[in-house]
A protein has these predicted regions:
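Conserved cytochrome P450 K-helix/beta-meander segment immediately N-terminal to the heme-binding cysteine loop
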Residues: 33, 309-331
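Cytochrome P450 catalytic-core helices
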Residues: 222-227, 233-261
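Short acidic alpha-helical/loop segments enriched in Asp/Glu that coordinate divalent cations
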Residues: 186-198, 253-262, 284-287, 320-321
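Conserved cytochrome P450 K-helix E-x-x-R motif and the immediately C-terminal K′/meander segment
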Residues: 1-2, 261-298, 308, 317
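Cytochrome P450 heme-thiolate monooxygenase catalytic core
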Residues: 76-238
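Cytochrome P450 substrate-recognition site 1
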Residues: 2-73, 137-148
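Helix-loop "lid/cap" segments that line or gate small-molecule binding pockets
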Residues: 47-52, 122-125, 244
């Protein structure tokens, strides 16, 4: 069943070259002759973070943060943090059974609650441990996400940036600042020989202050943390409701697959398919570092900005088949 909407290009990418074929988008994104061209207006929130840097600087930052994504770290997060946090969120739902004993919950709100707590742990934000604190934290992250994606906003961009920067001050005072202060104290204990490195928190903020680079400005860890907090929740929060709708429709058309609703491999494939069709960022912009001629003979001048549109590229029939616009968990 085709339930997919097409992308209407927003004003900030009108007037520049658009690339919608999967092969050309892939070529541009892989090319060393382009640099990041997105988030030009959202620099106060993402500037110099992993998402907006290129080449050697990007490689060094990725190497610094690599310990967060090693197998042992991911296993630690899954078993020590992720599963307990999910269980806690589900237990809180059980407390709200109706008179028939049925638990009902708003899936979007539930997923946001789970992801808020998980992103706090991996980034290094303390105190996201009650429903009240989680709601406050989640509101901050959603507001920061508005600032981080200001290019796509239909509001006055200057007003959005000003408003979200004021909101960020509250986030720093309530959550970020105390979390940094505690980690800096623990790092000093480690450097004085009173703690082992294994006793330090396993999160982004700790890594950045433990391996501080004198070329960084004081707010860089805040912007990097903003990237982690926004990105770690946005993709999943955006995809899950779509996934549920697609699965509901799929099971109606393919009742023989209903028994797979708890099959992890099937659900993983379905999740990948939902993300393919519903990426939270519909496009990335790149800037040419030199004159470039693409494989289709299109010429791009040095300094020219181009738009790689993921929505049509991920529905390219030459790559994904004639039913590319439809959900298929077996693709």
């Amino acid at each position: 069943m085709e339930t997919i909407r097409d992308l209407v290009p927003p004003p900030h990418i009108q007037g520049i070259k658009h690339f919608v074929d999967y092969a050309l988008v892939d070529e541009i994104l892989r090319s060393k002759h382009f640099r990041q061209g997105s988030h030009q207006e959202s620099q106060p929130f993402f500037g110099d973070s992993l998402l907006t840097i290129d080449h050697d600087v990007h490689f060094e930052r990725r190497r610094l943060q690599a310990p967060l994504f090693r197998k042992e770290a991911l296993e630690y997060y899954e078993h020590k943090e992720l599963l307990p946090l999910i269980s806690k969120a589900l237990e809180e739902c059980k407390e709200k059974r109706d008179e028939n004993g049925v638990v009902r919950a708003d899936l979007c709100a539930l997923v946001r609650t789970m992801l808020a707590r998980i992103s706090a742990v991996t980034t290094g934000i303390d105190g996201v441990d009650t429903q009240e604190r989680t709601d406050a934290f989640r509101n901050y992250i959603e507001q920061l996400g508005t600032g981080a994606t200001v290019e796509w906003s239909t509001e006055d961009h200057g007003e959005v940036i000003s408003r979200i920067l004021q909101i960020r001050e509250g986030f720093v005072k309530e959550f970020y600042g105390p979390s940094v202060e505690r980690r800096v104290g623990l790092i000093k204990e480690f450097e004085n020989g009173n703690l082992s490195e294994e006793e330090l928190p396993r999160d982004l903020i700790t890594l950045m202050y433990l391996h501080w680079n004198e070329n960084w400005d004081e707010e860089l860890p805040l912007r990097e943390s903003t990237l982690y907090l926004v990105a770690s929740s946005q993709t999943t929060t955006h995809a899950v409701p779509h996934l549920m709708i697609h699965l509901h429709e799929w099971f109606q058309e393919h009742p023989e697959d209903y028994e797979k609703r708890f099959d992890r491999d099937f659900l993983k494939q379905a999740g990948h398919e939902a993300i393919r069709l519903h990426l939270p960022s519909p496009a990335l912009l790149r800037i040419a570092l030199q004159d470039v001629t693409l494989s289709n003979d299109v010429e791009i001048k040095e300094g020219e900005r181009v738009a790689c549109l993921f929505t049509p590229a991920n529905r390219d029939k030459t790559v994904f088949g004639n039913d590319a616009r439809s959900f298929n968990p077996y693709r």
